[in-house]
From Swiss-Prot:
Its EC number is 7.1.1.9. GO terms for biological process: ATP synthesis coupled electron transport. This is Cytochrome c oxidase subunit 2. Cu cation A1 binds at H161, C196, C200, M207. It comes from Sitophilus granarius. PROSITE patterns: COX2, COX2_CUA, COX2_TM.
Length: 227
């Protein structure tokens, strides 16, 4: 969950988020170096009085400023393409969760088990307990076992929604009549917050998501209690 005055990415909670943070740092390093170099060149040109009135062409410098940007783009594109393929890859999921967006709440179905489905509504401000987060707490949290490959299917019953957990680098659009999928792995036990990230009507801001990552044994006990 993003905290007050936090201007950076949220703490990583999945292997995919760790890869995305590494790519972010990689790209930012390149951008900062380019910014410093260009700024230094501009300042040096502004504050010196040297001039060259007979420069007609410069084959060498034109070659350099063509090749170097191409190399920089390749250095950014290669890890980006690798990440794009990794984000869409799902290998032998051990759990399937179907998520349905409504105006304005979420429905969850655990398709691997019988009769496990529930709705998740935001808890109104007046009904919050101590230490609950305003506009983020729900009446039914979504439990998942950590360190487990999970397949997520997202759709919508009315308008377009978007199921998003920033700390797990997951954002899936829920489109009526379509199923979008993604993989999810939590690398630690915790509670993760998210919100609908697609404007879906008057109460768009009141569709929080709470994912509770627990141990596999606790998850199995929860499944048995719901059966």
């Amino acid at each position: 969950m993003s905290t007050w005055k936090n201007l950076f990415l949220q703490d990583s909670a999945s292997p995919l988020m760790e890869l995305l943070m590494c790519f972010h740092d990689h790209a930012m390093l390149i951008l900062i170096l380019i910014t410093i170099m260009v700024s230094q060149m501009l300042l040096s040109m502004l504050f010196n009085k040297l001039s060259h009135r007979y420069l007609l062409e410069g084959q060498l410098i034109e070659t350099i400023w063509t090749i170097i940007p191409a190399i920089i783009l390749i250095l950014i594109a290669l890890p980006s393409l690798r990440l794009l393929y990794i984000l869409d890859e799902i290998n032998n999921p051990q759990l399937l969760i179907k998520i349905i967006g409504h105006q304005w709440y979420w429905s969850y179905e655990y398709s691997d088990y019988k009769n496990i489905e529930f709705d998740s509504y935001m808890i109104p401000t007046k009904e919050l307990n101590s230490f609950n987060f305003r506009l983020l707490e729900v009446d039914n949290r979504t439990p998942i076992p950590y360190k487990t490959q999970i397949r997520i299917l997202v759709t919508s019953a009315d308008v377009i929604h978007s199921w998003t957990i920033p700390s797990m680098s997951i954002k899936i659009d829920g489109t009526p009549g379509r199923l979008n999928q993604a993989n999810l792995i939590a690398n630690r036990s915790s509670i993760f917050f998210g919100q609908c990230s697609e404007i879906c009507g008057a109460n768009h801001s009141f569709m929080p998501i709470v994912l509770e990552s627990i141990t596999p044994n606790l998850f199995l006990n929860w499944v048995i209690s719901k059966a």
